[in-house]
Amino acid sequence: MSFITAFGDRVFVASGDLIRTFRIGDDEGMTPLISWSELNPERIQKPSFEAEKDLKAVDKRVILCLAHSNMIAAHGRRLVAVGTNEKQIHVFEYFIDNNYKIVKAEHIVTSVVPKAPTAIVFDREDAYVVVGDRSGDVHRFSVLNGSAIEMAGAISMILDVAFSPDGKRLLMADRDEKVRAMRYPSTYVIDAYCLGHTEYVKTLAIQDNDTVWSSGGDKNLHMWSITNCSKPRRTIDLSEWDAPVRKISINVAHKKIAVLFEKKDKMIVVDLETDPAATQSVTILNESECLDVTSTGHYFIVLGRSTITVINLLTMLQATFPIDDELNAVLSATKDAVDNLFKNVTHNNQLEYEKRKAEKFEQIEQKRRRLNNQEPSTS
C-alpha cells in the first residue's frame, strides 16, 4: 500500500516499509524520515488485548495507513503516525531548523492494535491517534504512553476515519455503505448515520464543522450535514468514469475536490462553487495509475506508481517531483491490503454472513452497555 499526506509545504510519502519526505519547491530532494532500526524498545508497548498477547510476526513490514499531526496549538508537535501489518501503530516526532529543514526525527511510541489497522487520524489536540481496523473497531492511542481505549465498533471493516475541524465529531466510513458521525471523545453518542451509498464508502473529505463529503464503490460523491444525515445535501454522479472512487481530497481554500479512481492514470477536479458541479479531468503525466492524493496550500499532490505530481491550483500546471530508485521499486510493486472491497454475499454464504453480522451486533451492544456504565472521558 502507498500513501501521501502533507503539512504546510512538507510532504510525506509511505510505501512498503519506506517513509520519505520532501518540501515543495526545495531542490534538495527526498529524504528518509526514519530508520526502523532506530525504534526504541522501551517505547514499544505490550499488547493489552486478551486475544492478541503476542506481536504479529511478518516477513516484511508494510505500512497500511499514514497521518500527520494538526499542530493547532503554538507549542504543537510535528508528529507522523503509521499503522503496519504487524498490528502496530508507530508515532514519530521530527524537528526542523530555521530553514525548515528536518534536523532530527525520533521514535516516540509504538502501540499494538487487536486487528490490522486500515485508517488513522490525529485528534484535534494531537494527544491521541484514532485508528480504525479490519474488524470494524476504532481505538484511540495516547501519543505519550501508547495506552489504548476502545472508542466505537461497526459491523464491517472501517475504511476511513476523520475529524471535524473543531474536533468535536469523529466520522467513520465502512464497508457496509455507511458514514457515522459521533461525538468525541464521548463516541457512545452517535449524532447521525449518513445512509445513501449503495456500496462501500472508501474515503471522506471534511469541508467544515457540519459538512463532509464521501465516496467509494457506487461512484457517487455525496455531501452530508454532519449533524443531520437524513439524506445527502448534494450528490455528484461520477459513473461516467466507469471505476470505483479510490480517494477524495478537499482543498477548502480553493473550494475544489480531487477525485482519484481505481486503476486510472487520471483524476478529476470538482469545482464546489458551481451548481451543477463543474468537473475537470486531469491526466497525470508519465503515470500509469494514481494511488493517493492530498491537498495543501495551493496544491493537490498526487502519488502514482512511478511519480509524485504537484498540481498548482492557480494554474493547473503539473510539476513532477523526482523519487529515488528504492521508492520507485516499491511503488511499482505496491498492492492494496484488500483487493476487492465489494461484498460477495451469495445464496450459499448468506446464512454464514447473517450469523457473523448478528454476532458482531451483539459484541457492539455489549461494548456500548459497558461504555454507558463508565464515566465519559474528557481528555
UniProtKB/Swiss-Prot annotation:
Can you say what this protein is called? Answer: tRNA (guanine-N(7)-)-methyltransferase non-catalytic subunit
The source's domain of life comes to: Eukaryota
Cite the repeat ranges for WD: 58-102, 112-151, 153-194, 196-234
Q: What UniProt keywords apply to this chain's record, in alphabetical order? A: Nucleus, Repeat, tRNA processing, WD repeat
Q: Which GO terms describe its biological process?
A: tRNA (guanine-N7)-methylation; tRNA modification
Q: Which organism is it from?
A: Caenorhabditis briggsae
**Coiled-coil ranges (or none):** none
**Where, subcellularly, is it found?**
Nucleus
List the GO cellular component terms.
cytosol; nucleus; tRNA methyltransferase complex
